From Swiss-Prot:
Pfam families: Hormone_1. It comes from Isoodon macrourus (Short-nosed bandicoot). Interacts with PRLR. Residues 1-29 form the signal peptide. One of its GO terms (molecular function) is prolactin receptor binding. It is found in: Secreted. The lineage of its organism: Eukaryota, Metazoa, Chordata, Craniata, Vertebrata. One of its GO terms (biological process) is response to nutrient levels. This is Prolactin. Disulfide bonds join C33-C40, C87-C203, C220-C228.
Length: 228
């Protein structure tokens, strides 16, 4: 029976990795200007297609990574009750649902997406570094953390291009929410350290879901004139 379970678990893991790889290749195949190009023009529609696919990919990976960490490290520890409303991005005023988001002007919503993405640059870098040092950390968690860090940078770059097309010449100051959670990720106390990881992954899943929803709304509004 144990052998069958191990075999099934291995098959599911392989399927998950293959699915992630295929989606990653789909994302990378979308049109984008080559690095260093000067006169390359990508339509706003294509930029949004890529941004929406990237945001969905990041949210999928974030959810998988959180669920895997939760199952392996957080069972019976009561972390979820402590994680509510303790994200470093809580200082940014973000709409909680589609109805609230629809009330926000597209320029403000675009800038909000930029701020949230920038707020994750440093935490994602340290997440990768600290997961590497975790004893017996599943390799799949590290791979997902590395992939999310890379794709978040690509999404931020794409969003800057979108803002540049929607509002040419209007460059927003690089405002973002400062993260101060590194000491907690390095604590000697296991419970404190594991909760810090849990909370960070919980917040990443939450914010990636918000960004995914905001971008779908913005694409509908700016590309399809809200007819979707």
């Amino acid at each position: 029976m144990c052998t069958k379970r191990s075999s099934l678990k291995g098959s599911l893991l392989l399927l998950l990795l293959i699915s992630s790889l295929l989606l990653s290749r789909s994302v990378d195949s979308l049109p984008i200007c080559p690095s260093g190009s000067v006169n390359c023009q990508v339509s706003l529609s294509d930029l949004f297609d890529r941004a929406v696919m990237l945001s969905h990919y990041i949210h999928s990976l974030s959810s998988e990574m959180f669920n895997e960490f939760d199952e392996r490290y957080a069972q019976g520890r009561g972390f979820i009750t402590k994680a509510i409303n303790s994200c470093h991005t809580s200082s940014l005023s973000t709409p909680e649902d589609k109805g609230q988001a629809q009330q926000i002007h597209h320029e403000a919503l675009l800038n909000l997406v930029l701020r949230v993405l920038r707020s994750w640059n440093e935490p994602l870098y340290h997440l990768v570094t600290e997961v590497r040092s975790m004893q017996e950390a599943p390799h799949t968690i590290l791979l997902k953390a590395m992939e999310i860090e890379e794709q978040n940078k690509k999404l931020l770059e794409g969003m800057e291009k979108i803002v540049g097309q929607v509002h040419p010449g209007d460059r927003e100051n690089e405002v973002y929410s400062v993260w101060s959670g590194l000491p907690s990720l390095q604590m000697a106390d296991e419970d404190t350290r594991l909760f810090a990881f849990y909370n960070l992954l919980h917040c990443l899943r939450r914010d990636s879901h918000k960004i995914d929803n905001y971008l779908k709304l913005l694409k509908c509004r700016l590309i399809h004139d809200s007819n979707c």
